[in-house]
Design a protein with these regions (language model features):
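Secreted glycan hydrolases and related glycan-binding modules that recognize and/or cleave
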Residues: 1-265
């Protein structure tokens, strides 16, 4: 049987009044996972749509957890990280449990605690431990977690807690920059290639192999196979722009078709 590549999306949920594009039901089917930007505040439409996606399309619905902003808030307010992180993690677990979500995607772009500053490293270690202590039991009970960060943030002994490692590749200007990031994750960080996703943004362009400017999402979909093969593609900002004649929708559908061609009827 042919390999299935994951196509996952970030969705800015919780809006209404702007038409169908703002509802989860407007997602193309065959999406493997949708990360809800505002999973702490689900509206009635979200709550109606989530079980439909899960049941009819086997789509995993994940809570988006922004570790970067929590750390920055702690630093700017002079509080200890655990003072803000502990309640935020509790809120995440409650949202997952109460609303039947499949897990969470943890995004973090800060210092990963491998530098020379002992105080910084100690604070990062504490933050990471709080996170792992909270999500490891959930992972053992079947919830799934993505990591949107430098994979080295998670020690090797804890790597199995995460189903997918998502590389932020939207700033990659071409295939060779992309390949470099992929190879670093596989050969330096030791992440299995089938757990790895790259990220494309429908609003961004990149340079193709002939130095022409092309839309990032369709080009990156091809690179999942050409630069890998790796696990799949994460598409950012899916609800941001359905107005350009549904370009985002078409590109998302196109990426699914590129990676997992459906048999012709």
């Amino acid at each position: 049987s042919r390999k299935h590549y994951a196509v996952c999306v970030r969705f800015d949920n919780g809006h209404s009044g702007d038409g169908e594009k703002d509802f989860l039901r407007s997602m193309p089917d065959s999406i493997d996972a949708v990360i809800l930007e505002n999973a702490a505040t689900l509206n009635s439409a979200d709550l109606e749509d989530i079980p439909v996606l899960q049941t009819n399309f086997a789509t995993k619905v994940l809570f988006s957890f922004n570790l970067t902003s929590i750390k920055e808030n702690a630093e700017s307010s002079g509080q200890e990280i655990k003072t803000l992180l502990a309640p935020a993690l509790e809120q995440m677990v409650s949202a997952i449990t109460d609303n039947g979500l499949d897990g969470a995607s943890i995004s973090y772009t800060g210092d990963i605690g491998l530098g020379n500053n002992a105080a910084v490293n100690a604070s990062i270690t504490e933050m990471r431990q709080l996170l792992l202590d909270k999500i490891t039991p959930l992972a053992k009970n079947g919830k799934i977690f993505f990591l949107e960060s430098n994979p080295l943030f998670i020690p090797e002994a804890n790597r199995d807690v995460f189903t997918r490692y998502v590389l932020n590749t939207t700033s990659s200007k071409n295939a060779s920059q992309l390949r470099l990031l992929i190879n670093e994750a596989i050969y330096y960080a030791g992440i299995p290639s089938d757990k790895l996703l790259i990220t494309g943004d429908p609003e961004l362009m990149t340079t193709d192999n002939n130095d022409g400017l092309v839309s990032q999402v369709p080009f990156f979909a091809i690179q999942v196979i050409d630069c890998g093969p790796i696990g799949g593609l994460m598409i950012q900002n899916v609800a941001a722009d359905y107005s350009h004649a549904n370009i985002t929708y078409k590109e998302t559908r196109g990426a699914i078709q590129t990676l997992n061609p459906s048999p012709l009827k």
